[in-house]
Amino acid sequence: MQSLKLEFEESAAEFYIASLARGILEGIKSGALTAETGIWSLGRPVFRNTLTTLPISAELKEVLESFDELDALTELGIDLQPTLQRMIDTLNRCQRSINVDASLIIRAISAP
């Protein structure tokens, strides 16, 4: 399987992780992705555990921890829209909190 690795400075971690999370949530909100996507993307413990050493906010960590609950809410018949909007609003705050001097340079590496 071909893989893609994205590299950026740790000081931009909050912005990029919040951006990725927001994109996935918007996809779920629009119906392009299922709620189950949360479990298999950013909701995976292996992903969240990697973030423990990064300088990211408690708000962002809380949103990421909620990713694995989205499918369960759907199975319980609970409307996801309010939860998704709350999570997206939190991610908006995370994105806006970036230091204006932080480098947003990103490097992509493709590997077999």
Where would I find each of the regions flagged by the language model?
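Acidic, Ser/Pro/Thr-rich low-complexity regulatory regions
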Residues: 1-112
